[in-house]
């Protein structure tokens, strides 16, 4: 795609809303959430704008999931370039990050151990507002309704802390999983975004730690 897509003010507003949601929560908003945020009468109005954005090449819509919205890399670059003209000190220029791609994680060893690194990718930093530390290849469809599909590359920022509702990379015993984090008074729940999968309940005393937060999503084909 040559140049930036010509968007209406409303389309740009929705595109910004999608990017902010992905940055803050690790997943795009639903149609209903977009409608509520922007004062639309129904989710159908949001869907019409999303279809227009998809036709202009700014996003990709994934069928069969309420959060099936993916930003195209070109759209992200155009957003950051336009904002940098207004706020030149608040956003970095286009530069590349060198991110290790983590494959399967062996039990008991650090997630960034050398033996877990399949390869290294150079990725434009403009794809993220929060700097990731590594990419994790998604396995399975447990987060399908958050727009995270099998084979996607999840950009992860290393941290031990998470807020309710954020998508995390968590280690539970010998397993590493990607789920939505929820803490209640007595326990922790790791929630899938697919009704075919069950919530993982972390009981007190069970070996558990957060490895990182999802800060972005990249389709594997974008890095070819």
From Swiss-Prot:
CDD domains: S24_LexA-like. Disulfide bonds: none annotated. The keyword DNA repair applies. Residues 31-51 bind DNA. GO terms for biological process: DNA repair; DNA replication; negative regulation of DNA-templated transcription; proteolysis; SOS response. Gene3D superfamilies: Umud Fragment, subunit A, Winged helix-like DNA-binding domain superfamily/Winged helix DNA-binding domain. Keywords: Autocatalytic cleavage, DNA damage, DNA repair, DNA replication, DNA-binding, Hydrolase, Repressor, SOS response, Transcription, Transcription regulation. GO terms for molecular function: DNA binding; serine-type endopeptidase activity. The keyword Hydrolase applies. It catalyses: Hydrolysis of Ala-|-Gly bond in repressor LexA. Coiled coil: none annotated. It holds the Pfam family Peptidase_S24. It is an enzyme of class 3 (hydrolase). The record marks 107-108 as: Cleavage. Represses a number of genes involved in the response to DNA damage (SOS response), including recA and lexA. In the presence of single-stranded DNA, RecA interacts with LexA causing an autocatalytic cleavage which disrupts the DNA-binding part of LexA, leading to derepression of the SOS regulon and eventually DNA repair. NCBIfam families: lexA. Belongs to the peptidase S24 family. Homodimer. This is LexA repressor. It comes from Albidiferax ferrireducens (strain ATCC BAA-621 / DSM 15236 / T118) (Rhodoferax ferrireducens). The gene is lexA.
């Amino acid at each position: 795609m040559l140049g930036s897509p010509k968007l209406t003010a409303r389309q740009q507003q929705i595109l910004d809303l999608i990017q902010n949601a992905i940055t803050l929560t690790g997943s795009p908003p639903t149609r209903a959430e977009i409608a509520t945020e922007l004062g639309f009468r129904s989710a159908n109005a949001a869907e019409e704008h999303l279809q227009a954005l998809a036709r202009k090449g700014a996003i990709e819509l994934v069928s069969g999931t309420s959060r099936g919205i993916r930003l195209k890399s070109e759209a992200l670059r155009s957003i950051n370039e336009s904002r940098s003209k207004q706020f030149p000190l608040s956003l970095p220029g286009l530069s590349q990050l060198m991110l290790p791609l983590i494959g399967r994680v062996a039990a008991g060893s650090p997630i960034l151990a050398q033996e877990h690194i399949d390869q290294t990718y150079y990725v434009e930093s403009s794809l993220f507002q929060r700097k990731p530390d590594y990419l994790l290849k998604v396995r399975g469809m447990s987060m399908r309704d958050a727009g995270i599909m099998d084979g996607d590359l999840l950009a992860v920022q290393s941290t031990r802390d998470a807020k309710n509702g954020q998508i995390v990379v968590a280690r539970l015993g010998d397993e590493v999983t990607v789920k939505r984090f929820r803490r209640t008074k007595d326990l922790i729940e790791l929630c899938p975004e697919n009704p075919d999968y069950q919530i993982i309940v972390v009981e007190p005393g069970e070996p558990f730690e957060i490895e990182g937060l999802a800060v972005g999503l990249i389709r594997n084909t974008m890095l070819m």
